[in-house]
Each structure stands twice: as C-alpha cells, then as structure tokens.
C-alpha cells in the first residue's frame, strides 16, 4: 500500500482546484483561518469520498436505504482508507443517551452485574439465592452429623384469615402435621385462628436425622417440599436454627422476587429493567413549588400563588378567596407564616371537604356549587395534562421542572435491578457505580472484592471497562460520570468521549478525521490528549485533525496550512510540511504565529472597572462548594479552570439564569445559591452562545443583523420598482408576491428521509435564487436582489459603500472576521463559532447603554489565533463602552488579555468547585496552586 493519500483537483466550496499529499499513518494537522477551507478539505472532500466509496462497496439492497452519496468535487484521491469522522455536531440530545451508553461501558457493566452480581432483599433480609433441589440436598448433608431436622413447606406467609380451606387441602393431600405461627399441630387439631391477625403456616414434609444413607429420602422430601411450597422450603434443625431455601430468586421471608439475572435487567432503555415511574429517564416533570410560590413572604391576597395571578383571570383568585374563608385560612398572612396544614390545603387541596363556590363571569354566566377545593399544585398538574390548548400547556409548563424521580432516586432502574450488588452487600449497585466520577470508578475497579470464581468470570469484562475508563481519564474527562446525559456535554467533551470508543475498538488501518478535539480542554490536560492521539496513530491509523491549538500543531508529524484568507480569499495550500518547516514559511500566517513573529500582545494596562459588582453568595450547585464570588463590572472577566471545575455551573447555571430571572422574568430556575446582589447595576443581559442563529435555511446573516430590511427598502425605491408598484414586501422571500412559490422562497426543497437526516436539493424553478423572474428584473447598480444575497460581506461592503446605514451594519459582520460569508448564506450552514460571531455583529451596531453584561462560553471555538486577535478587539470595544464582558475560556491569549480572572479548581468534579485564584493575569500567575496560573506565567513572559 502507498504511504501517502494523494489528492488532485479538490474544488469543494472555496477550495481552488488544489493538489495535496498527506502522509499515511501520521498525525496530520489541518489549520488556517476560519472559513479558509480546512473543513472543506478534511470533511467535505477526504471524509466524503471515503464514506462514498464505503457505501458503494455495499450491496444494492443496503444502498437503497442510504441513497446515492454525491461524489465530492475532486478529480482523484488515491491511497484512501476507510474513514471515520469524529466531529462536534453529532452529539445525541436524546435524554436516554448517556456517557455510559455512548462509550458502551454500560453494556459491559450490565454484563458484569448479570454474571457476578448478587441480589439482596430490599427489605433487609439478606442475599437472595436460587438453589436447585440437588444443591439444597448438598447443603443439608453438610450439616453436622446426627443433626435432627424437619423439612417444612411454607404455604402461607404473613396473611390474615382463618385459612380453613388450606388445612382441609393439607389433610386431603395426606400430610399429618403443620406448623402454625411457630407451633407444631396435628392437622386435625389446629386451633381456630384469628381473622384479623397475620399467620404463617408450614406443612411438615419429613423429620430426619443427618446420617449416612438418607440422601435418597432427603432428595424426595426436598422435591416434595419445593413442589408444595411453590419453590420454597425451610429446614428447621430443632436447635432453633432455620435455613431458608428457594429455587427462585426470591426472598423466603417477604417474598421479594428478582427475575433471572441477565444484561437486559440492567438497561434503563428496556421495559424489563427501567423504573416504571419515570420510564428509565431518572427525572419526572413535576410542579416546582419555588416557581408556584416565587415569593413566600407575600400573602395569598398579595398574589403569592403565581399560577393564579388575577391579571390573567379572576376565576381562580375568587375561588381561592371563598375556599380560604370557608376553611378558616387568613388571606393576609404571608405564605411562609401559614401552618403546615394550611399550606398543604392551599397547595394540594381539601380532599373530600367541600366549600360553597359562587362565581359570575364577565358575560353574566353564573356558577353556584358545593365543590372540594382543588389546590394550586393539583390544578397546575391537571391543566397541563388535560388541556387541548398549546398555550395553556406552555403556561403550565412554566411552573414545572424536571425533578429527580422519587421512585428510583434518579438511578433510572427498577428495584429488581438496583437490589443486585457486586462485591458483597456493601458493594455498589449499578446505579451507584454509574454516579461515580471516572477517576473514582477506576479506583473502585482496583478495589473490587470478588471470590476466585467471580474474578475468573469478571476478568475480561473488567478489562474492557478499565481500558475505556482509562482513556476517558487520559483526555481530561476524569470528572464525568457514566450517568451524565449526552445532551449536556460540550462539543469538545462529546468528541473526546467518541474518541474513547474508537480507542477501545483497537482498529488499525483506519483514517480518522477529527474537528478540534482540544475544545474545552485546559492546557494541563492537552498533553494527555495529544498522547492519546499518538497512541491511535501508533496502532497504524492516519489521523487528520482540524486544529488551531499551537501545542497540538507543534507535536504533529505533518502540518497543512490552508489560506491565505477566508472564503473566496482562501482555499489554497499555503504551507505543507513538518511544524518546523511551516514555522519558517513567510507566506503562512500560522507559521508566523508558531515562530513568534506574530503574536497577540499583553495589554499595557488593566481596566479598573466602574467600582460596582455582582456578588453571588453560597453558590452550591453540582460540585460548587458554597462559593462567594464577586464579578467586577465594567471589566473584561475570564472564568477559568480545568475541565469540570465548575465554570459552566457558576456562570451558565447560576449567574446567567439568576440575572435573566430578575431582568427578563425568565422562568428558567437558577442553580443553588444563597443570595445575589448588584443586578440593579446592569440593564441588559446578552448571552452570546454558539447555538444556531436560525434553525431553517430562511435565516441568514442579512436577516439576522437586520440589514436585509434596509436592502429591501433600497430596492423598493428604485425607479423600476416604483413603475411596477413594488413595495418593500415584494423583495421578501418570506411572503407571497415576489418569492418563488415552488419552494416558498427557500431556494431549496426539503426531501424527508424518514429515519435518515433530511436532504435539501436546489429548487428546479428558481434554481436556488428564491425569487420569481419578475422580481429579479428589478436592479440596483446592475444587481438584482438574489445577486446581492450571493455577495460576500467583503463585496457587499464595497457595493453599498455609498449607503452609510447599510454599510455600517455590514461592517460589523466584517469586524468579527466574517467577511467571507455571503449575505444570504443559510444559517444552518454556519458553524457554532460563526453563529456566535454573527450574534456579536448584531450587538455591535446597536446603541450601547454601557450597562450590559455579555456572557460568552468558549468564544474561541473554531478560531485561528489571527481570528482570536480580531475577536479580542470586538470584545474590548464592548468593555470600552462601559459594558461588562464575561467569558468562560481556556485559550491563554484570551485569558492574558482579561482585566480580571476567576480561576476555579483545583481539579475537576468533586475535586473542584473552589476558587483557586482571582485578580489580574499577573496576580493569578503568581498563585502556585493554580494550574491556569502556571501556564499563564509562561505565556506572559513570551
């Protein structure tokens, strides 16, 4: 096999007919500015062709379900291996998908518990074992010689009644003696039993002395006892000891039964093992009392009950007033001062007790009736589940939250699965082991106490689990738990988890294509990620990694720099070679940063802010250890720390939600904290995340930033438009009139693929131009509206330079480094980083109040160092206007540019959640306990 992947004539997207050679079995980094064509080369050319060739190798029957994969725009690719893409966009949002299911560790855990687990009675009656008649005989014969015993068949266990028919049947079957409540009676002389008391009844099958020659008789008696006792028997050894046996997995004391242990019992995605209350989700949608009574200091008359606010309707407040008068509850007493009984009445209703309700509505309709009082919680639940109105359901949903299931306590499984332990009764059940962090899980596997037989069975299973956990640990995910929902993971976390699955497969000869695996990873953990990538390479695989991290680039075997610019100014191979060769290439911007010729300078001075703070006290959500944190306003703040240290919990779960709740009346409940102050110093909260700017191809940069309204105004003012009577709406692709009706102005037709992702194809009528031919006959400066939407931001800036209102808005898009995108580029095709910068652009042209709080979570995702320099200038513009910018970030160039750092740690998970250091970058760099400070010190000295 040749030792290179040779590509000729690649033209996907902005690639300019490039030729490139990529060494096989090496770690190859593809880098370049955002939009330069890196992903077009790695994913849309190399991976797409590898996938297409694989599909073509399948049978015609299999191909009919996959459809024809379009050949990428490339002349030829030689030396291609089977390709596996590990990107950041394919994270499952299904609530049933967890870290354990994605990595397949759960499959091995289920097998482990099915093979070496022991069930224990949930009522505390010890281990539950299943024994055959032969095993029971062997255990009885092992008793001391001359032991006197009687074999009993339990037929009534803790049941009320006189049980006369049972005694008649025992006599009819030919048995002579019974034991009733511990006393032996002749079956014909049993005293009359009390109807109202619980009774135990056992039939005496045989009486024996343990000695040679009794095996045959004992075996017959045991079989008879099991038959009569429905699989249970008791051995009474006459000296007061009793042995309980069962041929089922069933507790002989209370009857708690466990089915045969098999892997499906431990799956929360199968009805056999899932919790019957929450169906294996671990959470239930329940009414949240904190949302129903947001301010307990208010009285019922003052509107303490949010769902029954008199603003929307007077019906429920009237009912409440009349009910409380009837039941003697004071409406003027603060809710928190009501007795527990009174609060229960208000929340959950009066049960069967009725009150007289009289109500006249606005139309004169009258209700005069004696009814029970429903209670506000019961009312919200009923209206949510019974209404046919989406509006009402959404309103009621605002008073509900996903709370931990009270039946399974969040473990997702039923009692039969959770009663099985490994390593004795003190060992964990499968739910508990899934709640451990990866690091603790590894330690538990080392300390697991198994019998010799169990160890032999468990050894290959434990090895598979250990290998996968070790890799997760090695890529900085030691703080995650197997029960963590996949939908809550960041892009970088989910990608590294899928890497763990691939390393576990031990494949060789594969082409892996990765998209920025270092995202969300602290510098401390980056070296371990690089080692893991090298391990995959050493197995005989080729790794093509789209990456911007300088450390990763310097450790690569080969570097390909795509550029020189973005969009139509990119798409060329600027440099290709070893990192040292690229660093010497004067044409390569990447090379200039690697060699140190270009760099992001450290600010000459730090801003002092406006002297005000937002202060959170007692932040205790997830792993946060009751933190008191001050966020200085009027500064550029960076929240840092190793992965899992609590950054997102502090900023996104507590600060952002608490501020949104106060400023925007947001119903999203913040995480646990004691108090927050200083929100009055800000007027707006702007969350600039990486979610799409629109979920359909109709949304694009022009519509999102609002510049399209101005462009449509301009077209409506042209002479041709006035002659035809066209107004502004004629140039909208969202309403009838000027748009192409064949595709409803989308320019593309969606083809539903059912169980595959939907496919979009260009409209055959308008050929993707969105408008009908009459609309396209109107021109401004010889361009029609469709041609304007096809312009890049850079071209549009020149085209509209004479129209300041339009040029100003387009300039903001260029300022955030998106000069290469087209005005009409569908929002669905923008990356997370591009969407985030588009949101920044839309904020830039708004008039600043100087009292805004901007929150950004890892804004450097997908950005080259040159793009980061541009991003920092934009963020600094916000701060210079008096606003506060808060970023969660690992990138040292951003961290060193901040005015104030809040460093969390010291570790991830349970080892984190503390403030390790705060202050300027220079101050944090001096804190020895801070991992961030350690790397920052080096960066500040460069």
From Swiss-Prot:
Alphabetical keyword list: ATP-binding, Cytoplasm, DNA damage, DNA excision, DNA repair, DNA-binding, Excision nuclease, Metal-binding, Nucleotide-binding, Repeat, SOS response, Zinc, Zinc-finger
Protein name: UvrABC system protein A
Zinc finger (C4-type): 251-278, 740-766
Gene name of the encoded protein: uvrA
Primary location group: cytoplasm
Subunit comment: Forms a heterotetramer with UvrB during the search for lesions.
Residue numbers binding ATP: 32-39, 641-648
One GO CC term on file: cytoplasm
Protein family (similarity comment): Belongs to the ABC transporter superfamily. UvrA family.
Alphabetical GO biological process terms: nucleotide-excision repair; SOS response
